[in-house]
């Protein structure tokens, strides 16, 4: 069994050694331009077209929760990956826990009005504020996949009203489910906090725009943990300036790194983190990949395969 590996920023040598230890029967090598030798599996992040094109692979693993970098290249270069080759993403590998930590900490930050107290502190102003009430602090999760379900589970502990929206209806205990475009407005109407965990597909690009933001309650909060292309940044800034949106916590952006001249950096109601809400944990990723390859070799059904038409 031959496995090729490519990631532009990961410690390649660590991954090669870890994969060899986890799959001792495999010959694992770092892929470099010009390497056209045979391979059974490819593990990659933002792979060049040359890496995958023309290969009779058993499967490709994207080294992250999203596969948009591969699917976008496939649109321009359909020869990059044969339709018969299954494409897998890392379904969790520790990312769910990280998303839970990030979402819960920020929701509580807003619920306890720490954002308002920070602004008061900046002007040396001492003024206790009225507390928010849980029953009026509905949290909506936009995108009800694996990570969305993890976030919902963690927020249930805090007894907030929860709702989710996705393409198909979900049956999550304690979570009100909305499905399809025809129910999006009703979903948004009560979301005091909107948490975006949508996949990156042609249908979801620019979904968080002026029209969507206007359907939120006045003074809502936005937490974007998915992709920067989901948000029309000028529309968000306008909503923040008007007070329609009271605050935004943004981990992802249309351009990354976020340019120094972006007005998001200096906006008093915006908090920025550099795409760190959930990062791939190498040891857990290697365990998932080795387990999945073993299942594929046995002809077993496995989780995490991407529907190329849907984009996730």
UniProtKB/Swiss-Prot annotation:
Catalytic activity: glycolate + NADP(+) = glyoxylate + NADPH + H(+); (R)-glycerate + NAD(+) = 3-hydroxypyruvate + NADH + H(+); (R)-glycerate + NADP(+) = 3-hydroxypyruvate + NADPH + H(+)
Family matches, as Gene3D superfamilies: NAD(P)-binding Rossmann-like Domain
Keyword set includes NAD: yes
SUPFAM superfamilies assigned: NAD(P)-binding Rossmann-fold domains
Cellular-component GO terms for this entry: cytosol
Pfam families per UniProt: 2-Hacid_dh_C (PF02826)
Subcellular location, record wording: Cytoplasm
Keyword flag Transmembrane: no
InterPro entries: D-isomer_DH_CS, D-isomer_DH_NAD-bd, GhrA_Enterobacterales, NAD(P)-bd_dom_sf
EC numbers: 1.1.1.79, 1.1.1.81
Domain of life: Bacteria
Active-site residues per Swiss-Prot or TrEMBL entry: 227, 275
Enzyme class: oxidoreductase
Entry keyword set: Cytoplasm, NAD, NADP, Oxidoreductase
Alphabetized GO MF terms: glyoxylate reductase (NADPH) activity; hydroxypyruvate reductase (NADH) activity; hydroxypyruvate reductase (NADPH) activity; NAD binding
Biological role: Catalyzes the NADPH-dependent reduction of glyoxylate and hydroxypyruvate into glycolate and glycerate, respectively.
Family note: Belongs to the D-isomer specific 2-hydroxyacid dehydrogenase family. GhrA subfamily.
Name of this protein: Glyoxylate/hydroxypyruvate reductase A
Source species: Escherichia coli O157:H7
Gene: ghrA
